Every structure is written in structure tokens, then in C-alpha cells.
Amino acid sequence: SPFLVVTHMERVVEVSTWGNIAIEENIDARHNGATLKGSFSRYEFQRENSGVAAIKSFKTFLPASANGVYYRDDIGNISTSAMRVLDDAVEVDLRPRFPLFGGWKSHYILGYNVPIYEYLYNSGDDFVLKMRLLDHIFDDQIVEDFTLKIILPEGSKVGKFDSPFPVSRLPDTLHYTYLDISGRPVVTIKNVGDLTEKNIMDFELGFK
């Protein structure tokens, strides 16, 4: 059966002072099934509707408040995706440019925005960001190499990071965008061991 694995993933969470959190996921996936023999012909594949285990599409679920969703690869926007708003999530049907056969790889970028008030809590000048460290990518997901980058507003002082499972925290860095003077603090987290759906849990990051 088709066996899709995320070989590398970078999840970037950018907190804006304008009431918005921008999330972008860079994903490299590989079909770990039996390797396709010979060359691929889309015509033959569609004509024969062969039983070869190819992944044509997969579903991912975003937060219910997700908006401004985009799906693209190195070539540009991929228009074959479909989006459906459910009661508790936004379902996105992602369809790569080509069906994925055994041994084939795919790279894509999925991005969206969520309102900050759903994830940021404050008491005076102290803030706590609470949101998913890893989110749903596809059913029965396995993520081999994972990086989370949290970009805070310029001038923030980074506090404690709490993870629901063991992770490695790299040294904090600064991210500069247009008109930034002092830079925006970046907290970088790496996984320790493969991640699965059991790791879809919230982190907490304090800052001032």
C-alpha cells in the first residue's frame, strides 16, 4: 500500500503585532513503497488505471480559523488543490503535479494565516504563545527531520519554551525583514526521533 513519509519539514510560525500569525510549512515527502520500474507515462497510467500503488493526492487539516491558504512548489502555485471548510477544521486536498510512485519525491510549501487572539495570552507585559508544535500533514504521518522556527515581534525578549515531548532547542537567532532595526528573535526547535500523529500537541513559549 502507498507509504508516504516526510523526510524533511520546516514549520515557520511568524507572530505579528498586527493581530495575525503566519504559518508556512516547507515539506519534502517520499513514497517509500516499491520502486516504479521503467519510465512513467501519464497516458498509460490513466488509460490502464493500473493497480500500481501511486499517491495521487492526500488530505491535510488546518485550524478552523485558517485563511489565506496557499499551496505551491518550486515552479509556482499548484491549482489542483481543493479546500473545504468543516465545523472544526479546514480540509485541504493536496494534489501534487504528478502521482507519486515508489521511490518518488515531492517538495511543496503550504501556508496560511490564523488570528493571533486564538493562540496568544497575556498578563501585563508577559505573553504566552500556545499552539501546535506539529500539526496534521496527512493520515498516519511519519516525520523524519523536523524544524520549528518561531519568529517573534521585533524587540521581544524570549522566555521559557515548554514542549509536550523531548525536543532539542538550538541557539536563538535574529530575523530581519524590511524596516526592521533590531531584528526579530527566532526560537528554533529540532525533533529528537521520528514524529507521528501522537506528537500533534501544543507548545508554550513565553516572551515580553
Stretch-by-stretch model annotation:
Residues S1-K208:
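Lumenal/extracellular ectodomains and adaptor appendage modules
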